[in-house]
Amino acid sequence: MEIETGRMRITERDKECVRFVVEQGFATIEQLWKVAWSDQKNSSYTYNRVLSLEKFGFLKSVKINDTTMKIVTSTPKARIITAESSAYPTPVQGVSKDLVHHQLHLNELRILFQEKGLKDWRSAECLAVDPTFRKLGSRHVPDAFYISSRG
């Protein structure tokens, strides 16, 4: 299903990309390429799609002093579109810029796990707003958890 917003057609891959950023907090172009467009020869197509998603208010660039990579985060508009199609509660706020490097490393783990067939990754941000998770009685929210192919 594609969604028209203004003059941009939001594709399933765009939504997958936006959902990843909403759930993880931040992502690099290279990571989004692995998530949604890895069948493309290189990440230049991803870069152009991300620029369009920025232009139409779904993503925004984040300036981090000690990195040269382009890093994006989600906007309220992105969180709304993700919440409409998510089976789980969606984070209502972004992640603190203090956690960018930590989140980028977690992204690499998530991508690796997904490539190995693991599914249903739930980030700390998603777990923190999920009332069913809080009922488990844990005092600490883990960085993430996932469900293996064996359940």
Stretches found by the model and what they are:
Residues 1-93:
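Nuclease-adjacent, charged terminal/linker segments that flank catalytic cores
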Residues 17, 21, 72, 105-106, ...:
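Long, contiguous hydrophobic alpha-helical segments, chiefly transmembrane helices and signal peptides
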Residues 62, 101, 110-151:
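Active-site metal-binding core of divalent-cation-utilizing nuclease and nuclease-like domains
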Residues 79-86, 107, 111-115, 119:
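Short, charged N-terminal helix-start/capping segments
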Residues 90-106:
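A short, highly charged nucleic-acid-interacting micro-segment common to nuclease
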